[in-house]
Amino acid sequence: MELPILPTSVIGSYPKPRWLLRMYRLRDLGKIPEEDFKEAVKDASVSVLREHERAGVDIPWDGEMWRTEMTEHFTAKIGGFKFYGPVRVWGNAYFNKAAAVDKLEYKEPLVLEEFLWVKKNTTREVVKIPITGPYTIAEWSFNEYYPDKESFIMDLAKIINKELKMLENHGALYIQLDEPAMLNHPDEVPLAVEAINKAVKGIKIKVGLHVCYSNYYLLADYFDEIRVTQFALEFANRQFRDMDFLKKLSNKELGFGVVDVHNPRIESVEEIVKAIKKVFEYVEPELLYINPDCGMKLLDRNIAYNKLVNMVKATELVRKELEREGKKTTEFRTLKDI
């Protein structure tokens, strides 16, 4: 499969419509039937999917409309977890942090329903399915059952592997493991790498790895060892500084973060063009994808949309220059190709 050179994509989350947030609150209060809530989620999914497509994104997603939070969604579906109540993250932000109280088991599909819905409703050939990785799920949960962190993480890796195989069997082409916590403890990075490789064992489709707001020099030491096709990383937030670690990227792809999801300022087309050209010093255009730094759910929806619009406009300008050099398309690479 061939894609336009510099394919554009998203990382995962996107601002939920206000009416969907109200439906979440009503559902939590038990004031609406589950079927009404599910209908609202599906409507929001299509709405955001169309928004991404209207912005011109080549490889969209539905902004995780089905998910409350990136770990809670998964721990609620995996057997062996228990919720005690909300935990404060920062300021007035809380999330339901789960505890492993029994051996974890794969009880039901984790994201299959949302993937099939997006696949049915998209106008694009490829969508990217974000899935929180085993290390981050463990790091952001309590362990009240396993004798050590390693056995906890490896059981999660086995469960994620089952989900990935199910998605592949149902036609998924591109999965992204989200591991924002994998560099939190430098001495545990080898454990995180082992868990990722276990999670993707036997998978043949395209797999990306998203890591953000971390020491990428630490990650770069494992570029070759981690069995993924692409590393989706944030650069706009760090103002595109200190990118020498990319020299170790070898034949892996880079998902290049060009808009800051923690700053409401909408980046100009010109500055995004400049950033893309700068990364050409390290990565060949054929190995480069363009995306936001991270999930966009904390932004105002209109701001998020216009950031995507400018991201796509900038990419199209750079494409025109590359086309004059005879570079028009890029191969859609999978794990079979690395």
Curated annotation (Swiss-Prot):
Record key words, sorted = Amino-acid biosynthesis, Metal-binding, Methionine biosynthesis, Methyltransferase, Transferase, Zinc
Which Gene Ontology terms describe the biological processes this protein takes part in?
A: methionine biosynthetic process; methylation
Q: Give the main EC class.
A: transferase
| Gene3D superfamilies hit by this protein | 3.20.20.210
NCBIfam families hit by this protein: PRK04326.1
Q: Which family does it belong to?
A: Belongs to the archaeal MetE family.
* The protein, known as: Methionine synthase
Native organism: Pyrococcus horikoshii (strain ATCC 700860 / DSM 12428 / JCM 9974 / NBRC 100139 / OT-3)
